[in-house]
Amino acid sequence: MLALLLSPYGAYLGLALLVLYYLLPYLKRAHLRDIPAPGLAAFTNFWLLLQTRRGHRFVVVDNAHKKYGKLVRIAPRHTSIADDGAIQAVYGHGNGFLKSDFYDAFVSIHRGLFNTRDRAEHTRKRKTVSHTFSMKSIGQFEQYIHGNIELFVKQWNRMADTQRNPKTGFASLDALNWFNYLAFDIIGDLAFGAPFGMLDKGKDFAEMRKTPDSPPSYVQAVEVLNRRGEVSATLGCYPALKPFAKYLPDSFFRDGIQAVEDLAGIAVARVNERLRPEVMANNTRVDLLARLMEGKDSNGEKLGRAELTAEALTQLIAGSDTTSNTSCAILYWCMRTPGVIEKLHKVLDEAIPQDVDVPTHAMVKDIPYLQWVIWETMRIHSTSAMGLPREIPAGNPPVTISGHTFYPGDVVSVPSYTIHRSKEIWGPDAEQFVPERWDPARLTPRQKAAFIPFSTGPRACVGRNVAEMELLVICGTVFRLFEFEMQQEGPMETREGFLRKPLGLQVGMKRRQPGSA
């Protein structure tokens, strides 16, 4: 055999093996051959990995659907289905589908609620945290959300007074940075009993520890989270590559793997601080970590330190850049759409007492136009833009979706960005920002069912109630107390990791007197 490899025929043998490596998966799934695929997507996962690495997977997949139709094969086993009629079939209760091996790339420390693929394990984990996020339970969180937004307002008032341009009256800032500081401090408060301190210091930083006993170091948490999301989503296209990623010549992977470790270290540091005996003895708050400590593992025992930290990490990730990205997108779309901010001023001034700076949730939760603005931003921006992959497990009967039959081992997804901008669903103005489309008198049942910013079914976002409360209070505060001017040209640029995030939003900001025209 060695002689053959070293002979002139060795190169041909190697080439033949390489061809077979990519051809066999294609031949094995003959039932998928009639589904069109861009480039080499039908033969190799590397096509999708490359699109994800470039940070615009959602655009490439959307363009593929515009070219080929509702069914597009984006990997040898993976079919993207741009059909709102497929949402319940893919993500709904009772279909038996599992999260695909894409989620293996997101595992750090220990499998958590987000990345576990086992149905029984997910049920156990979700039971531990779901009651924490009920509408009844989140009422006790509001005071901590409120306190952080008050500090946010204090800092913006300070900048409005000390950094204003004497000619325009506006202070210049990157709004995304401040929404990041706010979101991280809120989730720090809710999950670990204390904020990170980003708002107070006006910068991105967090303590991290490799182990509970190791000395602390400090990292930029927002940057770490962004890099982790990008590399994990990329490696999710080829999970077997993860153990070797840091050895690849592209520094994107090396830096990304370091970010995965750093983000885990942030969770280790926060859990370590929260579990210190003196903190435990004096703690009277029911934060998310306290709820997690009440949970049981698969043996009925209290969660071990590793699993507890992994679940805390899940909450940190889920509750930070999702809120900041959406808040930034709301400001951007409201600023670029004439008349929206003026309507917000009117409804907010009417609903909130003049002597109140930061409204309570009760003051803003029933303002229709404010809710419409938030929903419309979630539709047109789609923070979670990619199709979340689900695998048909072994033993499952064949399933027909959108006119095509899929078999065990196949992976399917519904791309939310494409669904949320479909003119067939939303009408000819689908790519325009129109809050009024959410008026119940105008909204159709089909549109309501096609709106999936938090996904749907048993793996839907468990923290939806908290997220919606945060966004209502943040937006109710920001648009009522401040005026803005756009200080950047062109559209707001975004980059996609696991989430689609803005790259910045440069604006001018000044105080507004509530009640003024």
Swiss-Prot record:
It is an enzyme of class 1 (oxidoreductase). It comes from the Eukaryota. It catalyses: benzoate + reduced [NADPH--hemoprotein reductase] + O2 = 4-hydroxybenzoate + oxidized [NADPH--hemoprotein reductase] + H2O + H(+). Keywords: Glycoprotein, Heme, Iron, Membrane, Metal-binding, Monooxygenase, Oxidoreductase, Transmembrane, Transmembrane helix. Heme binds at C461. It is found in: Membrane. The chain crosses the membrane at residues 4-24. It is a single-pass membrane protein. Its EC number is 1.14.14.92. CDD domains: CYP67-like (cd11061). This is Benzoate 4-monooxygenase bphA.
